[in-house]
Swiss-Prot record:
Assigned keywords, A-Z: Ribonucleoprotein, Ribosomal protein, RNA-binding, rRNA-binding
Domain of life of the source: Bacteria
Biased composition (Basic residues): 1-22
GO biological process, one term: translation
Family as reported in the entry's similarity comment: Belongs to the bacterial ribosomal protein bS20 family.
GO MF annotations in UniProt: small ribosomal subunit rRNA binding; structural constituent of ribosome
Gene it is expressed from: rpsT
Keyword Magnesium in record: no
GO cellular component terms, A-Z: cytosol; small ribosomal subunit
Cysteine pairings via disulfide bonds: none
Function: Binds directly to 16S ribosomal RNA.
Designated name of the protein: Small ribosomal subunit protein bS20
Region (Disordered): 1-28
Length: 86
């Protein structure tokens, strides 16, 4: 454990950020899984509705730097193509 006051503070801040980022990442993955579940059932309307909810969340996480913008684009592109194939 850190002995210097500033290092202790940084450790606390780092842990706080880690938990916040993990929470956001988990939430994003949950919405992606909801879209995938709707696709698996073959219900195009439900998949489109779930996609409409998921898309701005993924975009927001990419804008905040939680994930890379290309990863966000890849998720959206792949899910959109799978929905259109239904």
């Amino acid at each position: 454990m850190a002995n210097i006051k500033s290092a202790k503070k940084r450790a606390v801040q780092s842990e706080k950020r880690r938990k916040h980022n993990a929470s956001g990442r988990s939430m994003m993955r949950t919405y992606i899984k909801k879209v995938e579940a709707a696709i698996a059932t073959g219900d195009k309307e439900a998949a489109q509705a779930a996609y409409a909810v998921m898309k701005p969340i993924v975009d927001r996480k990419a804008a905040k730097g939680l994930i890379h913008k290309n990863k966000a684009a890849r998720h959206k592109s792949n899910l959109s193509a799978r929905i259109n194939a239904l």
